[in-house]
Amino acid sequence: MSSKTEIPIITDEGDFSAEYETFCQAMNGVADGTFICVSVFGPQSSGKSTLLNDLFGTSFKTMDLSAGRTQTTKGIMARAVDFQTKVAPRVLILDCEGSDSRERNQQEAQNIERHIGCFAAAVSDLLIINVWNHDIGRHSAANYNILSTIFDIYFRSLLKARRKSGNHRPLILLIAIRDAEEDGAELTQRTFESDVHHIYEQSVPKQYHGSFRDYFCLRFWFIPHRRYMKSLYDEKITQLKTDIKEIFDSLLGAETATTLIPLTDSSIYYNNIWDIVRTDKDLDIPSQREIVSNIRCEEFYLEAIEQFSSQVGKVFADVTAAIQVSLGQQSSTFLEQSPDAVKDYPITKLHNACNSFKLTKVLMDLSQECVALYRRKTRHYIPKVVTQWATKLNDDVLAGLKKVAHSFAKGIRESTCQALGAVTAPFRVQITQWLERHEYSDDYASNTNTVDILVPDLISDLTFPQKRLTDLMGLLGAATRVFHKCISVNWAHEYSGLCDTGILVNLPPNDVGPNSNVRIGDNAIETNAGSSVRLSVGYEASEPMVDAHIDDSGAFFSDIRQTGVYSPHLYAFLESLSLSTYGKALSLQKLPAAPPDVANAYDAVCLLHTIILLWYCETMMPLSLIYDITPEIDHVIPESNALFCETMGSILAAVAEAVSSQTRTITASMTQATARLMDDKLYVTLGSLRGVIYESARKTLERSFFSLLSSAFVAPDHQGLLYLQTRLSSPSIYFDLHFDSSSRSSPTDSILPDTQNPVYKQYTDIYLFSTLPALLSPLPRAYNTVGTRLSSGSSSIQSLLPRYRAVPIVAALDMSAFYIPQAALSSFMDRVDAEIIELINKSLGEFFSKSFPLVLQNKIHTKLVYDDQGAQRSYISENSILTEFLSEKKGLISMAQLFEGGTLITENLHSVTIKPTSQEKIDAMLRCAEAEWDKTYQEALEIYRTNKHKDKYKWVWLGLCVFLMLTRKWVYAVLLSKYCLCITILLLSVGLFVYQRTTPDERNASFSIVATSIRERDVGQFWDATKRLAQKVIH
């Protein structure tokens, strides 16, 4: 397909033409829209348009000689013509405006000539430079300036873009020399080539000098005069048509085919290139396919996502409507004996409206159609760009699927909770009333807040109000009666109805194995054994077969077998449970007459909770096993079970918090006391403290919770639940039901190696390895447990642990985890240990910032200035002071460095490295401390010097005193003589004269020098000072 007329790409004003965009849009839908771009430029009126018309049969406007030489082509004109080559089926011809025109010179708009040259060089596969023969050697007339522009833009932008797109061929420059003659053609070619190489060397970076032929290919056409040598001209044109086809096939080659874009996309690329060129920005031109691929892939992405959103919106509306209809129904209680109760069940109606399997298939089909549409329309574009948008499309499609699936799951969850609410209403009323009772709150608060702190026992005792716990035991009994009331024939038939409508899918027991191959179809799940479970849309549940309550456990198991829901493993477990002493007692709502002794109160409580919850699970659990649409559906927790767990959990939390609060108090105070010692064993001591606190808290929690459970569930005379001894001492059920006689290891050894409670292990083994794999089918949503094998009949199969969280069963196992040494205690002690570590780190940090600066000053001041009794210290010499100072300073610096971090190593606990503060803060504190240390050092020196003079002259004074004592008679005689009196009067007169003739500053300075000279026994200094003072007095 070609254009019938010439279309402007760039207008005379320098704008991108809207006509070209319209033409490209009209090319949309062409099977192969690729093309080769050929452009021609040269001086004005050099015959460019005429040459194109003769070569390609176009009709570009040519110059009218009668009107004079004027500008004919303005901007860039284009036309697409069919031209079959090995590379593309058509050629896009660009007729560029002539250079050096009078009109552009008058408009002072010669810059557009450069822009057109840049644009043509950027988009063309073949450049034709049209030049007159007689202009060879002239700079402007021969288009040398255009060649300089081509070389410049090529190495700044085009080379990088061509290499990025995989195009390593040289750019073809076809020089058309007009009005040429055969004579002198060879000389003309050499001259032109020499000029081109010279321009090349001047225009390109130095690293490309001498490599012209690696990047450009020059071809010459010598075309005779069209008017005066008509026949030769026509022959040459015919020859050139063949020549240009060979150029397309050979010189362009296969590399060009991989970089071409559809003609319909060329307007996008050309418009972007023109905007860059016109604004004189630094050209960073990506490959054609890259820029167009990004734009087109975005368009096709939007188209695909719009189609998907529209179709999914309809499905979403249908699902929403079905949910609204379902939730709008009045839910019936399944404790009634109405045969029609199951037909009104909200979940049944919801699945009749939108079956989960069929919904999944519809959504998957819509998503696949969306992706296929995008892939089909983007197959010709760059794979990297296609993948980027495909990833975004995939994310948006998944978001759309999740929106519908979330709505579906929300409807199922709300419907399930609506039905469970009717069943658990009596229990919820009772437990709500129990939780709202406040008569025990004061006693509870007093018992939790008045805890004696003892180290290392940490806490002496922790008790709770006995009335509250006795009341809780009565509430558990009421809950048991509610659960028992829920076991009715209607529940069994409800399971059957749910199975037939697709809510609960359980494969027959023969198909439970790791090799089952499940294929989802429109209305069935088919396995490799040929069996199937019907998933009928709109299927009505069958009528109940029995309408009476269960009077005994045998009738219950007989009726539940008729539903065909549970596996033989579950039948065997339930039957063994019902025949046990406690099972019969629970069924008849009474206790055994002569219960045996019990040795482990924890096991008794664990078994009580587990059996109550398991019995409850057998009636409620199937409602949780809904098809796995979203993760939210894994967390459908029955309200009654949640309240039960929360009640017991709150009691444990209260005990744990009381213990934890004491550990925090002990940790903070003991860490501060340890830090004040400040020795090299700081972190060793803190590690030991951590171990003492940890072990004390552990013992306290065990003792407190043991007291709590035993006082709540076991009578003081050890009667009540003592009949559980039979169950506790009996052989493990899983060995009788599920393992070969040669099996010697428990299946939970590899999964729960730390669990030591036999009851906990017994029920965990049964439910992990027999009941759950049968109940939580279909198999594709399960994973294997390596190294553990179960027996089914005579063949051994690998056990399967499904991805489902059967919340009631998990809650039951969590209740049995009240076996303190392994489950609840371990979890709590991890938190206690974390608090101990955090508080040690925090307390050391606070000690460092608040108390340690005083420690630094007090220690060195005490060490240098005062002794332990508070008296001033005496030293032998100044060197001893310096040695003591440096030694103490080194010790304080080492002490400060301890706060940079250390390891708490505790027996039976993992080692922990803590960092109370940073090295920067330590350095800053030491810098501040050193200034005070220097003052303390100078103070010690001053004290030493003072004491030194005192010690030196004390014997002189003592001798003088003894001498005066011995010669006191002669001293009195001298003092009373007339000579002494004269000398005294003379000295007083001199002193008075000095006082009057000198200033106080002069006297102080002189007397200070005199005193120093006397102290240092410097006679010369003494006489000099005396002489200067006499001179000041005389003058």
UniProtKB/Swiss-Prot annotation:
What the entry lists under Gene3D superfamilies is as follows: P-loop containing nucleotide triphosphate hydrolases (3.40.50.300)
Give the EC number(s) listed in the UniProt record.
3.6.5.-
**Annotated positions binding GTP:** G42, P43, Q44, S45, S46, G47, K48, S49
Its primary localisation, in coarse terms, equals: endoplasmic reticulum
Q: Which enzyme type, at the first EC level?
A: hydrolase
Q: Which UniProt keywords apply?
A: Endoplasmic reticulum, GTP-binding, Hydrolase, Membrane, Nucleotide-binding
Purpose of the protein: Probable GTP-binding protein that may be involved in cell development.
> What is the name of the protein in this document?
Protein SEY1 homolog
Q: Which organism is it from?
A: Giardia intestinalis (strain ATCC 50803 / WB clone C6) (Giardia lamblia)
